[in-house]
Amino acid sequence: MVVAGMTLTTGLSALQGDPVEAEEALPLPARDGRVVLYVMDQPDLGLTDDMAPHIDQINYAFALLEGGEADGSHWQGIRQLEGYLARHGHIDGVLSVGGWGAEGFSDACATAEGRKRLADSILRLMDRYGFTGVDIDWEYPGSSAAGIKSREEDVDNWYALLALLRQGLDQRQTERGRDYLLSVALGAGAEQLAMVDGERLGGLVDQAVVMAYDLQGFDRITGHHAGLYPAGDTPNSGAFAVNALTDSGLFAGKILLGIPAYGRVWRQVSGDNDGLHQRAATAGNRTLRYDELQQLESQGYTRHDDEEAQATWWLGCGNFVSGEDEASLTAKADWLRENGLLGAAVWAQHQDPGGALLMTLSGALAPSPVADGD
């Protein structure tokens, strides 16, 4: 990491002996919550210096599992990340492992020897590239979602893996005198939430990212894919997921509300009820980036608010589009502040080129001004 006014070597630069010049610290806006940004590995990460004050933590996605160990040999943008973190020393760099459809967790964690091998490899990869934390994104223990292998013992093995990582991170903290964090990504559906013992999980992790998106979109009935509150006949929502976790004993101050930087599109939708909860010709499989959502009204779409769900949608050209805008982001920022959450986690940078959603969210988390006399 970088301290203003000092020249440090870290991660790849340290390995290759190239010094990194630290810049003067940028002014950081005050926020009532932590902003975590998932950055997917690709040749151009799309990170600009003007985004940096709005980011507290980058989760670099993803290390994959090969032969029972964490592997980053496929990474193309790691040098860019190194440089970015070196220039902006206030940002924590966290290694995310797994992701949707990532195979190998169940087999690797099936035995004590396998779990130790995997945990040790994750920590080695973290150390090699100068990350200061680990985010485990196993989607999902005990489930064959996306066709991955699973077994009945996965949930217990997941906790056991987290315990080994916690032990290794704590040991590094003692030896090196700095904090190392452990995070998990959690599904927001009832089936995924049922596997979580919040009290047990809270004793192991510093952060839990609730992936409160893709809640709808896999059938032909339109709806909010990332609504804050339930709507229609489905309970799935960000608030539902967070409340389920806190009810199970997870401290709200460890929870990050997941926010999508993309919308979902259903095609050939009737105008009844302004398109909401209507049958479409397609499922909501097509996605639009945040900057594309911002252009919809100029293309003839009409924007609508669902006050019950605190969600936004657009209807136009026969299409129904569910996604975020300033109003829905502000509602989520207000809610997570009022409920004592740690903050928000945005998936993902490549869907928010230029950082408009990131900056809007950061602004929405700014402390409310104190009125005279308060």
Where are these regions (language model features)?
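Short, well-ordered coil/turn segments that N-cap beta-strands
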Residues: 31-33, 56, 89-93, 130-132, ...
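Conserved, mostly hydrophobic/aromatic
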Residues: 58, 95, 136, 165, ...
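Glycan-binding loop/region signatures in secreted carbohydrate-active enzymes
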Residues: 97, 259-335, 361-374
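Non-cysteine beta-strand/loop elements that form the S-adenosyl-L-methionine
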Residues: 57-63, 96, 137-139, 207-216
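Glycan-recognition patch characteristic of GH18 chitinases/ENGases
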Residues: 21-127, 143, 153, 164, ...
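Substrate-binding surface in catalytic domains of secreted glycosidases
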Residues: 36, 67-76, 120, 141-293
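Short acidic, glycine/proline-enriched helix-loop-strand junctions
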Residues: 145, 149-158, 305-306, 353-374
